Amino acid sequence: MKLSRISAINWNKIQDDKDLEVWNRLTSNFWLPEKVPLSNDIPAWQTLSAAEQQLTIRVFTGLTLLDTIQNIAGAPSLMADAITPHEEAVLSNISFMEAVHARSYSSIFSTLCQTKEVDAAYAWSEENPPLQRKAQIILAHYVSDEPLKKKIASVFLESFLFYSGFWLPMYFSSRGKLTNTADLIRLIIRDEAVHGYYIGYKYQIALQKLSAIEREELKLFALDLLMELYDNEIRYTEALYAETGWVNDVKAFLCYNANKALMNLGYEALFPPEMADVNPAILAALSPNADENHDFFSGSGSSYVMGKTVETEDEDWNF
């Protein structure tokens, strides 16, 4: 069998400047959950009711499931369709950071929660029909041989499906609760925003090579898939937040982010403003300066703790 020639990646010869731009953004944004002082949230966690704690654990377990899908199936499936080696490299970075995101929720659990409560949430996630359904819908497209439909599914996961879960820590943060946990979630949101934008960009570039009929067919597919996911997400939200009185607020947040997902694909918003009218407190919590602890763009700040080096002299070690 004749082996094909393998070419080394050359970052000094870029076919698409967006690959380097996004690579630089992702690497400059790099972070790890161990650097966020989650233990500072223990007092606030203890003020939550048992129902609020259970809701939070379930929300984060659902998010862990989505990150796991994107890490082991989503980004790797997109790599097979990459046009440039630099695109493959960016997608490998995306895959790794999805693993970091999944690890982050385990850091929250080990810091704030009892093991039996977390185990119960994981068991719940495996038996929750809407949660399992959205995973199945997305995975079905990841294993298909249609590259652009994979990208559509990936953008909807990155830019839409996460947000029924992201709403809760932003809500608590807007009330001064679990602020360090919210800082960690903002780091995740920052990553997901870049992921959704980049994959949507690659989708739009690929569309330019298609006929008008093919483009229209993909648009209709995207809208149908979004509505299938939206209807399922409404069921998930109504069940998850049933006892809270927050269901309508979360639904508005879903519509808001569904519109953003469509825009990442180059399409117009679907949901009217009155359906996507998000509570200003939530939008403020999402903003880069939402918490004084957190520097959104550099990943630094008092809630993201990096070690500092100080030069010493020999006499410093004479105790």
Swiss-Prot record:
Catalytic center residues: 105
Superkingdom to which the source organism belongs: Bacteria
Recorded GO CC terms: ribonucleoside-diphosphate reductase complex
Xref: CDD domains: RNRR2
Cofactor(s) this protein cannot do without: Fe cation
Cysteines engaged in disulfide bonds, as pairs: none
The keyword rRNA processing belongs to this UniProt entry's keyword annotation: no
Residues the record lists as binding Fe cation 1: 67, 98, 101
Pfam families found in the cross-reference section: Ribonuc_red_sm
Cofactor note (record): Binds 2 iron ions per subunit.
Entry EC number(s): 1.17.4.1
Subunit structure: Tetramer of two alpha and two beta subunits.
Protein name: Ribonucleoside-diphosphate reductase 2 subunit beta
Source organism per UniProt: Salmonella typhimurium (strain LT2 / SGSC1412 / ATCC 700720)
Lineage: Bacteria, Pseudomonadati, Pseudomonadota, Gammaproteobacteria, Enterobacterales
